[in-house]
A protein has these predicted regions:
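Charge-rich amphipathic alpha-helical interaction elements
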Residues: 1-210
Length: 210
């Protein structure tokens, strides 16, 4: 704890600081709660997207087995040509949003290639799109967790350090100022008594001199 001046001006500084901490703490606490809620929501969405991806793969596993046996699925038939991302903002945090993906198809003869290859390619695009969406959601969570950590640290700083420290400073300064006031009153009374005593002695001397 830094050493403080036990003065009236310092008392005002400490009271203003305490007022500021108490004013901003509810806002920080609300932001912390909002971030926690948003993170849970996004994590649930990412889980749902991955579940959809798993269901898609499970429903298509027979096709995958056929591809493996026949070795007829062209290698590199699907490529991601572009990932479309937008921008969002949650609790003051800029985050990427997934808006879709563009895919390229490798060269293959539509007339000579079995129809199931084209159907499989469509399923692969859907699966890859879900993977990309989940990755963007993971990035959202990562960015929000960074902000949540910083916000939580500020909340803890205000609650456990700054507010108690400032309250203690105010108490310390107030006690010191009260002690000074008492001392000033005592000194004033002593001074008045001394003056009265001197006046009395002077009066007695005047009487004796007559």
């Amino acid at each position: 704890m830094a050493k403080i001046k036990l003065t009236k001006n310092e008392l005002k500084v400490q009271k203003d600081a305490l007022k500021m901490y108490r004013r901003y703490l509810p806002t920080l606490t609300l932001k912390k709660q909002q971030l926690q809620s948003e993170i849970r929501t996004i994590e649930a969405k990412a889980k749902a997207v991955r579940k959809e991806r798993e269901d898609l793969e499970f429903g298509f596993k027979e096709w995958i087995a056929v591809f493996s046996e026949m070795d007829a699925f062209p290698e590199g038939i699907i490529t991601v040509s572009n990932i479309r991302k937008g921008k969002g903002n949650i609790a003051g945090v800029d985050i990427p949003t997934f808006e879709g993906a563009d895919f390229g198809r490798g060269d293959y003869d539509l007339y000579e290639t079995p129809l199931w290859v084209d159907i499989a390619a469509n399923h692969m695009e859907k699966a890859m799109s879900l993977d990309l969406e989940a990755e963007v959601l993971d990035e959202q969570v990562r960015l929000l967790e960074i902000e949540l950590l910083a916000t939580s640290q500020r909340v803890n700083l205000f609650e456990k350090v700054k507010i108690p420290e400032t309250e203690e400073n105010i108490k310390k300064i107030s006690i010191n100022m009260a002690d000074q006031q008492v001392s000033a009153v005592v000194r004033s009374k002593i001074s008045k008594r001394k003056i009265a005593l001197r006046n009395a002695v002077a009066s007695e001397k005047e009487v004796y001199s007559l």
